[in-house]
Regions:
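Internal alpha/beta loop-helix hairpins
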Residues: 127-145
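A short beta-loop-alpha structural element at the N-terminal edge
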Residues: 5-19
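Conserved catalytic-core motifs of GNAT/GCN5-like acyltransferases
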Residues: 118-123, 140-151
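Active-site rim helix/loop that mediates acceptor-substrate recognition in acyltransferases
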Residues: 18-60, 66, 71
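Conserved beta-strand in the GNAT
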Residues: 60-62, 69-78, 85-90
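Conserved GNAT acetyl-CoA-binding A-motif
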Residues: 86-87, 112-126
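Active-site acidic-Proline motif in GNAT/NAT acetyltransferases
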Residues: 79, 92-94, 98, 126
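Conserved acetyl-CoA-binding loop-helix of GNAT-fold acetyltransferases
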Residues: 91, 97-110, 131-136
Length: 151
């Protein structure tokens, strides 16, 4: 298992986080027989870093593989007056199934616990990997929304 250290995302991490979002999201779609959703330069998702850092400064945790000197995962979170909302979480395909997402989720859960606030998230029930992770750590469906896309 990798030597993972959790820490706050710094400005110097934006490019690697963008590439991580690009790679992990595309890998998830391709593994399910769908085309990648990101195309073009791997730094395209840097927009997530810019927007979320402006909205909630300092509220992204990264999982760094200290031995490989690279990021294994990232998770944005959004403290609000009544709750902490879980944002975009990504794990690099090389680290799928190694507990990185669980570590990131535990970190954000501890943030919410320290603030004495509940956690909330919106997630697709069709994403069984995420649904399973969230269910294992105690999240339960509260409301169901029907979502459709145009083909």
């Amino acid at each position: 298992m990798a030597n993972i250290e959790l820490r706050a995302m710094g400005d110097e991490d934006w490019g690697e986080v963008a590439s991580l979002i690009y790679d992990s999201t595309n890998a998830w779609y391709v593994a399910r027989g769908r085309p990648p959703i990101f195309a073009g330069p791997k730094d395209g998702p840097i927009l997530f870093c810019a927007v979320y850092e402006q909205l909630d400064p300092g509220c992204c945790v990264v999982a760094e593989d200290r031995d490989a000197n690279r990021l294994a995962g990232s998770c944005f979170y959004h403290p609000r007056s009544t709750h902490v909302s879980l944002g975009i979480m990504n794990v690099h395909p090389d680290y799928f199934g190694q507990g990185v997402a669980s570590q990131l989720l535990r970190y954000v859960t501890e943030v919410a616990d320290r603030q004495r606030k509940p956690m909330r998230l919106v997630s697709s029930a069709l994403n069984l990997d995420s649904y399973s992770l969230y269910n294992r750590v105690g999240f339960v469906p509260r409301a169901i929304y029907h979502d459709m896309i145009q083909k």
